[in-house]
């Protein structure tokens, strides 16, 4: 069918050149550049193709009017993917006709080089994050075979990290990459023998603890040093699996938490005190039959995916608008939610069919080579502005921090989960519920609603409006991280896609020990799937790294870049979109001197303490237990 819509060539180019469209800065990873202009212009054509030629009219209308947001419309591809690192290392980077073929690597440096090429190439066949799991476990055999010293491992790792941060992706973007580190060899790999260069090795992965430690230490040291100006490396985003046998006081743990205290780069995946299963990272590619009556977890957080799985596409629901339009009528609100969920389902089914058809037709040659099928990829539905949903539904009487407000939020999330089970049974596809990062969507929804619905409650100002992400707390609510965790614990557990609680700090943590204790206590006392520690820091052109928010260098007065996390990854605040800048201005930072801090008399307990005293030190409005 022919589309009646046209895209003005002159307006498209002129808007970009003049930076007249807020979407020029919607993505903090994409700077103003020729490549950005090409992507922006092409993206408008592709977006209109999706909306007019692929999706049903009601989906196009719902997106254009801001009832929901269909992500990545500017890219004719799936969303994110986790790859089998073991497959790449055992088979090499090859298999696409007419393209250069690399045999399986035999050495550490060549293995890292192939991984850079792999991630950069596959990024061009997907819209979002590309991920590898068990990075330290699978690369350890190469360190053993090459008999590498620490300086040699560090040099190779430095080259790897710098190469991954080159803006080589379309749109002059850096490839969006995630690496998950085991730290301790997983039980299901411990007795397996690596295959290197086509030869089975006499040792097992479980024999390589020393080599894993070298890899982890080298990677951490490279990230801690930063680039030549002291900037943090935005990618790869490291995720660390914290299991019950994690050595909190091991020889390299201080370095891990010193890096976290300074730059806050890692995600910590909670295998200590959550319903996450360490083996799920490798299980999806082996499950021939999936139980569609249960909601599976994708694994590895917002920007990581377990091996051979990921997400075909993401649709986020504008919950704030639902609350306003159906004020004081929860039943009507949930009925409207159902309508939007069904539109989201149908659009994701249409996208999966389209991507699968062109996958089989060769449009994504490297994905076809290394993935084979997209059957194990999820269809992802997210929520945005649940705090504003509560505020509008209750006409300002409650928000997500009150007991009644949390109950409303929990019922909404449970309702979505129940519908997703139905969707799985109806379609035969995997669905998951994600706390979508919604970097630009939070602003787009609020901007649209202010224009259409006078009086709607939102965060920020009318000039810099936004909605609170997913079911997160208002950004200015509290400086107590333990209070925030207690309030978020029951809601964060309801997500089966990515979710994370970012502990935003106004400056670096005072020490590696303080950072370690914060992470240890957080993961042992709360059933949160993922957390980050997110300090704010500044970069002076002359003096480099400076802890805290400094628009001018305290030493020389030069203008500084101020860096913090924008929904998952670190970028300068100046590169944020309008809504995210408004959010950053309103944020209350968590205190670096928290209850149970090592400097506090309560900080001497071990990891088996109950943590009840910590929860009780800051009174709050709701119950920390899950709301049924």
Model-identified regions with their sequence ranges:
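Conserved catalytic cores of very large enzyme subunits
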Residues: 2-375, 396, 402-555, 559-562
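Hydrophobic/aromatic-rich, well-ordered segments within soluble, folded domains that form packed cores
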Residues: 177, 181, 375-396, 553-584
